[in-house]
Amino acid sequence: MAQRIFTLILLLCSTSVFAGLFDAPGRSQFVPADQAFAFDFQQNQHDLNLTWQIKDGYYLYRKQIRITPEHAKIADEQLPQGVWHEDEFYGKSEIYRDRLTLPVTINQASAGATLTVTYQGCADAGFCYPPETKTVPLSEVVANNAASQPVSVSQQEQHTAQLPFSALWALLIGIGIAFTPCVLPMYPLISGIVLGGKQRLSTARALLLTFIYVQGMALTYTALGLVVAAAGLQFQAALQHPYVLIGLAIVFTLLAMSMFGLFTLQLPSSLQTRLTLMSNRQQGGSPGGVFVMGAIAGLICSPCTTAPLSAILLYIAQSGNMWLGGGTLYLYALGMGLPLMLITVFGNRLLPKSGPWMEQVKTAFGFVILALPVFLLERVIGDVWGLRLWSALGVAFFGWAFITSLQAKRGWMRVVQIILLAAALVSVRPLQDWAFGATHTAQTQTHLNFTQIKTVDELNHALVEAKGKPVMLDLYADWCVACKEFEKYTFSDPQVQKALADTVLLQANITANDAQDVALLKHLNVLGLPTILFFDGQGQEHPQARVTGFMDAETFSAHLRDRQP
């Protein structure tokens, strides 16, 4: 008897195990989003911890995590570093696996305040979920100035970290500006004026006077930096608006064009004349007069300094940090003054000879300025188009540098030319992928002629209009990698097209994931994408024919033959 019971148990277990072997190949093997990414939260006064327990074989996208407070003020969230994941269509993305804990600092929360948390993830098998949104109720939190002060600093540091260069770059830019054709030829003249025409000053005295002149110039720039940083605190939000970013991009493009010599930007000549006369009235050779000379010189913007100075001012305005604003422009002025100090002490023998190379330095700064519009527009047009703009800028710069280097006669410049040419070829790759990829995509999209639907009513109407023909509904989204793989590799296959020749093809694009999209997914009981549904001539779905996850052309063709009603 015991042997029979044991045999019966083995039969039952083996039946459950082997039943999976006969499941439909397109049947969903994926868990709901709440199981794939188990979300939880815990609040303790100002401290809130958001946690995700991520199922093995699934991952969350770092850039898709968004937190929006309602009737509450929070510090900018500091997302931890993830691991890199790469796919064919979106390149490298940071993702989280296993477990994610995100601490959030609540500065103030009124009664009934909430936090809206949005996140999105995928499975390694090529199945992506629509963005998930959770509402976190917050306990009332009274604003604490002492607690919020460090948060303000961290926010400023975060804004600064996102900027294209650090404050120390201002020193290098200042040194570089000193070697432009508008500035370098003036240094011997300025040196003579600063020393008051006295030829027998000691080295220490000459160095002291020049240093005082540079400090006067730095004072003007530092004050300008403080003013712009203070204004930036009020207009940081405006600096993130798309229209403002586009406007600034246009302005800096024009400034770059001025560095290329298309036109000249400087103070009105009448104002420059007045400032120059004021400077000339000061007594050279005396510390007080030299300091005033430097302060006035800081107000006279030459055509070569206008564009770089404007770029640094934008950097300061974005940071909103008073110390950073003053310090950055102080370093900029110090960089411009270092060559002057060297010339004053050691004479003109350290001064390079004037020539076409100075115009080339000016042009190179034009390309540096052009990087700012790309940096600004990248926030508006997205990473893909941003990469293409960086590629175009790289091709233009390295191409110009290569052509310019051809004028050199020295043998070692041949190595530099090879490096520049190689850099230009590497830079053009994203543009090449875009050009060939766009053509290929356009061709692929014409292979299957989908009728677009949006709502449940439109789906029902399309099923009625099918008039007895079988219907295939493809659920697609731009954020679904496997959906794009279906478009590129599966739907373009002639065998697949032939198998679908007598089928009405519908497609719902749920990229926006709005209320209508959510209602459609709920109506169809769809967990995520890609999902392809098949309906018979009476408009009834065949659940066994449903496809979830990517299938190549051969597998999908076999599925159509075996499963399509």
Curated annotation (Swiss-Prot):
Thioredoxin domain sequence ranges:
434-565
GO CC entries: plasma membrane
| EC nos | 1.8.1.8
* Gene3D superfamilies referenced in this protein's UniProt entry, alphabetically: Glutaredoxin, Thiol:disulfide interchange protein DsbD, N-terminal domain
Q: Name one GO biological process term.
A: cytochrome complex assembly
Membrane-topology descriptor = Multi-pass membrane protein
Annotated TM spans: 163-183, 208-228, 243-263, 296-316, 323-343, 357-377, 384-404
Extent of the signal sequence: 1-19
Keywords noted in UniProt? Cell inner membrane, Cell membrane, Cytochrome c-type biogenesis, Disulfide bond, Electron transport, Membrane, NAD, Oxidoreductase, Redox-active center, Signal, Transmembrane, Transmembrane helix, Transport
Q: Mainly resides where?
A: membrane
Question: What InterPro entries would the database entry show?
Answer: Cyt_c_assmbl_TM_dom (IPR003834), DsbD_gamma (IPR035671), DsbDN (IPR028250), DsbDN_sf (IPR036929), Thiol_diS_interchange_DbsD (IPR022910), Thioredoxin-like_fold (IPR012336), Thioredoxin-like_sf (IPR036249), Thioredoxin_CS (IPR017937)
- Per the UniProt entry, the disulfide pairs are 122-128, 182-304, 480-483
The protein's location, in the record's own words, is: Cell inner membrane
Highest taxon above the source species = Bacteria
GO MF annotation terms: electron transfer activity; protein-disulfide reductase [NAD(P)H] activity
Entry-linked NCBIfam families: PRK00293.1
Q: What family is reported?
A: Belongs to the thioredoxin family. DsbD subfamily.
The UniProt function text for this chain reads: Required to facilitate the formation of correct disulfide bonds in some periplasmic proteins and for the assembly of the periplasmic c-type cytochromes. Acts by transferring electrons from cytoplasmic thioredoxin to the periplasm. This transfer involves a cascade of disulfide bond formation and reduction steps.
Q: What is this protein called?
A: Thiol:disulfide interchange protein DsbD
Q: What is the lineage of its organism?
A: Bacteria, Pseudomonadati, Pseudomonadota, Gammaproteobacteria, Enterobacterales
